[in-house]
């Protein structure tokens, strides 16, 4: 049970940090992704 809780906390924290950085600074790498 503890492993599951720690994994969830780790993933959620990384996700929040990733989205915060992504929305604060748009990626400067040119993407050829067409939407």
Curated annotation (Swiss-Prot):
GO CC terms, sorted: chloroplast thylakoid membrane; photosystem II reaction center
Keywords: Chloroplast, Membrane, Photosynthesis, Photosystem II, Plastid, Thylakoid, Transmembrane, Transmembrane helix
Transmembrane segments: 3-23
Bilayer topology term: Single-pass membrane protein
Keyword Membrane attributed: yes
Signal sequence bounds: none
GO terms classed as biological process: photosynthesis
Superkingdom of the organism of origin: Eukaryota
Compartments, as annotated in UniProt: Plastid, Chloroplast thylakoid membrane
InterPro entries: PSII_PsbT (IPR001743), PSII_PsbT_sf (IPR037268)
Cysteine disulfide links: none
Pfam families: PsbT
Role noted for this protein: Found at the monomer-monomer interface of the photosystem II (PS II) dimer, plays a role in assembly and dimerization of PSII. PSII is a light-driven water plastoquinone oxidoreductase, using light energy to abstract electrons from H(2)O, generating a proton gradient subsequently used for ATP formation.
Subunit structure, interactors included: PSII is composed of 1 copy each of membrane proteins PsbA, PsbB, PsbC, PsbD, PsbE, PsbF, PsbH, PsbI, PsbJ, PsbK, PsbL, PsbM, PsbT, PsbY, PsbZ, Psb30/Ycf12, at least 3 peripheral proteins of the oxygen-evolving complex and a large number of cofactors. It forms dimeric complexes.
Cross-referenced PANTHER family: PHOTOSYSTEM II REACTION CENTER PROTEIN T, PTHR36411
Protein family membership: Belongs to the PsbT family.
Stated name of the protein: Photosystem II reaction center protein T
Species for this entry: Citrus sinensis (Sweet orange)
Lineage of the organism: Eukaryota, Viridiplantae, Streptophyta, Embryophyta, Tracheophyta
Originating gene: psbT
